[in-house]
UniProtKB/Swiss-Prot annotation:
A Gene Ontology BP annotation from the UniProt entry: cell division
Protein's UniProt name: ATP-dependent Clp protease ATP-binding subunit ClpX
Domain ClpX-type ZB intervals: 1-54
UniProt keyword Cell wall biogenesis/degradation, yes or no: no
Keyword Protein biosynthesis: no
């Protein structure tokens, strides 16, 4: 029941006491009434309390060592990158807490957005995901290659913010303190010398569009996504406290670093500094190299923290398979244990899985698919074979030369 009179009885709001003649609308419940003004006031109170809860959470940000401990539980290797990320994330949320709790403007703390550079499968996305999970903040992933500047067919940059809002269950206050990871950022680089005629002409435009939300702005986001339309209802979100982490492989950037350092082909009379491999060059990257690769100076300036990740070696991939809390070997052992079957991987089998991932140039992200290929038939048959007690995965099984070894009761 809503609106004016019922059986000629005047209705009053049970909360403020105003009559139906004094307000726009009164909503009826079970022997209780509430007016539109009290509904609006209630929404505002709830909104403020939610914001206070978010702020209270941020006052207890884990210290860098604590963040590193969490990362070490899930991420193998990349020690320098993990330390850099731990410090940057701690400083970012400390800045948010500091800014929200102070009324004066004596100190203007800038955002510590992060650029991660590393090959495919080195753990860039997983690092960002793990940080967001450990902080219990909303997290969203976007692919830079799907974004376009205004006027092109594709996805508006504001849709990245919509993903974060959705991850926060449309709680804008929580979303405003979340983390966004933008992958493949190197694919929208504006090429420097020897520009290819096939390069993405909108790459620089996308950087400019991303720049606005990364540096901090109040953005209007279509609640259903897609392009903006006149008279469309929008969600307003302030991005000044959203942590942006962008990542990419930046294939070939080590050559730019070599040129800057004056490295040449080793020959007689040359006194150049010796660096063992490309991984060492990755640790030498500075903003000048990134600009030469094709990111615009303004964009680079909003990414003060640069974390370089190394190509994972066979030993790293074996550790990833076995050591973390969510290690793949542990996951598949748990799956088979539900059928009462023990699962064992030979050491040579683990080495073969890691070698395959390196050969395919997929890094850590390719490990699961290799195990799936190896165990598909086994996982299909095992539930129907009640006499099987143990499965042993051998090197030959990984290489497709034989089937896994089965032990029966």
């Amino acid at each position: 029941m809503a609106g004016s009179r019922t059986n000629d009885i005047k209705v009053y709001c049970s909360f403020c006491g105003k009559s139906q003649d004094d307000v726009k609308k009164i909503i009826a419940g079970n022997n209780v009434f509430i007016c539109n003004e009290c509904v609006a006031l209630s929404q505002e109170i709830i909104k403020e309390e939610l914001a206070e809860e978010v702020l209270a959470d941020l006052t207890e940000v884990p210290k860098p060592k604590e963040l590193l401990d969490v990362l070490n539980q899930y991420v193998v290797g990349q020690d320098r990158a993990k330390r850099a990320l731990s410090v940057a994330v701690y400083n970012h949320y400390k800045r948010v807490s500091f800014t929200e709790s102070r009324d004066d403007d004596d100190v203007d703390l800038q955002k510590s957005n992060i650029l991660m550079i590393g090959p495919t499968g080195s753990g860039k996305t997983f690092l960002a995901q793990t940080l967001a999970k450990s902080l219990n903040v909303p997290f969203a992933i976007a692919d830079a290659t799907s974004l376009t500047e205004a006027g092109y067919v594709g996805e508006d940059v504001e849709n990245i913010l919509l993903k974060l809002i959705q991850a926060a269950d449309y709680n804008v206050e929580r979303a405003e303190r979340g983390i966004i990871y933008v992958d493949e950022i190197d694919k929208i680089a504006k090429k420097g010398e020897n520009v290819s005629i096939t390069r993405d002409v909108s790459g620089e435009g996308v950087q400019q569009a991303l720049l606005k939300i990364i540096e901090g702005t109040v953005a209007s986001v279509p609640p259903q996504g897609g392009r903006k339309h006149p008279n469309q209802e929008m969600i307003q979100i302030d991005t000044k406290n959203i942590l942006f982490i962008v990542g990419g492989a930046f294939d070939g950037i080590e050559e730019i670093v070599k040129q800057r350092l004056g490295e040449k082909v080793i020959g007689f009379g040359q006194n150049s500094r010796k660096i063992d491999d490309n991984a060492s060059y990755m640790q030498e990257i500075i903003s000048e190299d990134i600009q030469k690769f094709g990111l615009i100076p303004e964009f680079i300036g909003r990414l003060p923290v640069v974390a370089a990740l190394e190509q994972l070696k066979t030993s790293d991939l074996i550790r990833i398979l076995t050591e973390p809390r969510n290690a793949l070997v542990k996951q598949y052992q748990a799956l088979l244990s539900y059928d009462g079957v023990e699962l064992e991987f030979d050491k040579a089998a683990l080495e073969a899985i890691a070698t395959k991932a390196i050969e395919r140039k997929t890094g850590a992200r390719g490990l699961r698919s290799i195990i799936e290929e190896t165990m598909l038939d086994i996982m299909f048959e095992i539930p129907s074979q009640e006499d099987v007690t143990k499965v042993r995965i051998t090197k030959a099984a990984v290489e497709g030369k034989s089937k896994p070894v089965l032990e029966t009761a």
